């Protein structure tokens, strides 16, 4: 899907949101969807695919006008608006800020906080994490796990009648599934041991590639001189 055009993407996911969209942004792939009588999803297209696909995220200038309209409609309809985007709203990553955080995200933060929107869901990193815009005020952001990434968990979000919310994760028991389906794959049968090591290797390789491709020659030299223990510690920073 990384090489898909905007039109192709909308066609691929037609049965997973677009066909039942309440409203569509004419300038992007953003749309709204009524999850229930009191809950509306604001699905924001933060991807950059024109003229070329980019890793980093951005909300188009024209889309902000559409967002303002949706904020007003949600208030008029008396529904809770839950914004969702692929890229992160806040600086969730320590080393991948440029690739993960939406460009000029403060503009989006200001709009959402003006309307007292309490929560924003995102992915991209897909490392289960949450933070708040400011320590004692502002919007919360939850970076949701990827079900395909160890420890293979999904999020359960509950909105209460008093307009507060709770969120927790639920792990998928891969070892139980493997036994039930009589799998012979040792990695699945011993998933709780295999998964952490596999994920650590992924993060290590990502960190290595980021340093290796750095324009600063000194960065590459530093990596070469790191001990095995230091490199393993680096793989845990994301």
Each model region followed by its residue ranges:
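Extended active-site neighborhood of metal-dependent phosphoesterases/phosphodiesterases
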Residues: 1-65, 165
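His/acidic metal-ligating clusters that form di-metal
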Residues: 40-42, 54-140, 224, 238
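Active-site metal-binding loops of divalent metal-dependent hydrolases
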Residues: 46-47, 86-88, 123-126, 145-147, ...
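Active-site-adjacent helix-turn-beta-strand microarchitecture at beta-sheet edges
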Residues: 2-11, 21-28, 121, 130-133, ...
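Short strand-connecting beta-turns/loops that link adjacent beta-strands
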Residues: 36-38, 76, 135-136, 149, ...
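A short C-terminal boundary segment appended to hydrolase-like catalytic domains
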Residues: 160-238
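Composition- and surface-driven signal marking solvent-exposed, interaction-prone regions
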Residues: 55-57, 156, 170
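Extracytoplasmic/secreted cell-surface and envelope-processing proteins
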Residues: 52, 92-93, 130-131, 150-152, ...
């Amino acid at each position: 899907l990384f090489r898909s055009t905007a039109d192709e993407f909308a066609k691929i996911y037609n049965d997973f949101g677009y066909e039942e969209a309440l409203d569509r942004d004419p300038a992007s792939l953003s749309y709204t969807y009524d999850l229930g009588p009191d809950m509306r999803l604001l699905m924001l297209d933060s991807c950059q695919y024109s003229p070329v696909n980019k890793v980093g995220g951005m909300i188009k200038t024209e889309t902000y006008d559409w967002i303002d309209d949706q904020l007003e409609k949600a208030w008029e309809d008396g529904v809770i608006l839950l914004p969702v985007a692929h890229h992160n709203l806040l600086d969730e990553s320590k080393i991948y800020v440029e690739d993960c955080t939406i460009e000029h995200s403060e503009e989006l933060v200001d709009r959402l906080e003006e309307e007292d929107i309490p929560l924003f869901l995102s992915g991209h990193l897909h490392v289960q994490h949450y933070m708040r815009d400011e320590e004692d005020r502002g919007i919360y952001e939850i970076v949701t796990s990827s079900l395909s990434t160890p420890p293979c968990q999904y999020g359960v979000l509950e909105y209460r009648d008093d307009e507060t919310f709770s969120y927790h994760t639920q792990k998928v028991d891969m070892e139980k599934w493997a036994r039930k389906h009589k799998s012979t794959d040792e990695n699945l049968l011993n998933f709780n041991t295999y998964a952490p090591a596999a994920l650590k290797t992924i993060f290590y390789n990502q960190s290595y590639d980021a340093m290796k491709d750095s324009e600063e020659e000194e960065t590459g030299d530093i990596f070469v001189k790191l001990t095995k223990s230091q490199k393993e510690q680096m793989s845990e920073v994301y």
